[in-house]
Amino acid sequence: MASLQDIQRRISSTKKTRQITSAMQMVSTAKLSQIQRYGRGYQAYAARLEAVVEHLVAAHLFDNADAKHIPLIAQRPIRKTGILVVTSDRGLVGSYNANVIKQTNALMARLNLDTTNTAILAVGGNGADFYKKRGFEVILEHRGVSDVPSFNEIRSVVKTVTSLYESEVFDALHVVYNHFVNRLTSEYRDVQLLPLTGDTLVAMGGTEAHKAELDIQSAYEVEPDTTAVLNVVLPQFAQSLVYEAVLDAKTAEHAASSTAMKAATDNAKDLIGRLELQFNRARQAAITTEITEITGGMAALE
């Protein structure tokens, strides 16, 4: 049985741990509130940009013969697939990273991907480290994403991604991440980003029926020409999709961290209660033993 001093030391160390996890929970909760406010502001821009592209799809600009030669739209044989994996840089986020990696591995299995035909682009250290150790080619690694990432911060990543795609380093790109649902729940998402197609809009929440309602080809006169318009709009759309994914994933990360730290704080509280009960019982047993010994000694003197 542990001594009273050992139990006291465990109680003291557990209380210190509880203070740390409680502070980390409050910090994560504050970051979550901050990024949610920021995200709501960005959604206004993203919704307008998506509406513009949605109308271009409905106007059949993507089907234009000239448009098919634009690098971000052009279809080509898929020899190598790029996967942009969004994870966190550190742990203490529950099953957040494990879920992304598990589902990404399942995606690779469905697409028959392995180390020979897959290029990993990692936003976050956990994903980069995991796939490096397993022999995958990590062609892009971006660590140290801000708690509330700015658009400019992610724009450099997207420019690198699109440049690699246009250089035919890979022939298709999937973006995989955890989508924030609420403070307790996130769900895995996989969006095929490149080549950009009308189907990308369906994956992002649009529907074929909705696109049919927008069949407004005759309402558009494109100036100066289709290629010029799409060359401006499509890179912005790609940047927006990736930024939304990173912002969404970062929101889910803060929520996961807050939930994990709350669970750790609650567990520490329960452990302290059990240790204090154990301490009281041990102290009571020690006092009882001491009284018995004193009583026995007095009886022997009589």
From Swiss-Prot:
Per its UniProt record, what InterPro entries does this chain match?
ATP_synth_F1_ATPase_gsu, ATP_synth_F1_gsu
Q: List the protein's name.
A: ATP synthase gamma chain
* Any GO BP annotation: proton motive force-driven plasma membrane ATP synthesis
Record's function text: Produces ATP from ADP in the presence of a proton gradient across the membrane. The gamma chain is believed to be important in regulating ATPase activity and the flow of protons through the CF(0) complex.
Q: Does the keyword Nucleus apply?
A: no
Q: List the disulfide bonds.
A: none
PANTHER family linked: ATP SYNTHASE GAMMA CHAIN, ATP SYNTHASE SUBUNIT GAMMA, MITOCHONDRIAL
Species annotation? Leuconostoc citreum (strain KM20)
GN (gene name):
atpG
| Tagged with keyword Membrane | yes
Query: What is the recorded membrane topology of this protein?
Result: Peripheral membrane protein
Subcellular localization, as worded in the UniProt entry: Cell membrane
NCBIfam families per the UniProt record, alphabetical: ATPsyn_F1gamma, PRK05621.2-1
Q: Would you identify the family this protein belongs to, as annotated?
A: Belongs to the ATPase gamma chain family.
Record-level GO cellular component terms: plasma membrane; proton-transporting ATP synthase complex
What GO terms are given for molecular function?
A: ATP binding; proton-transporting ATP synthase activity, rotational mechanism
Keyword tags: ATP synthesis, Cell membrane, CF(1), Hydrogen ion transport, Ion transport, Membrane, Transport
This protein's assembly is summarised as:
F-type ATPases have 2 components, CF(1) - the catalytic core - and CF(0) - the membrane proton channel. CF(1) has five subunits: alpha(3), beta(3), gamma(1), delta(1), epsilon(1). CF(0) has three main subunits: a, b and c.
* CDD domains membership: F1-ATPase_gamma
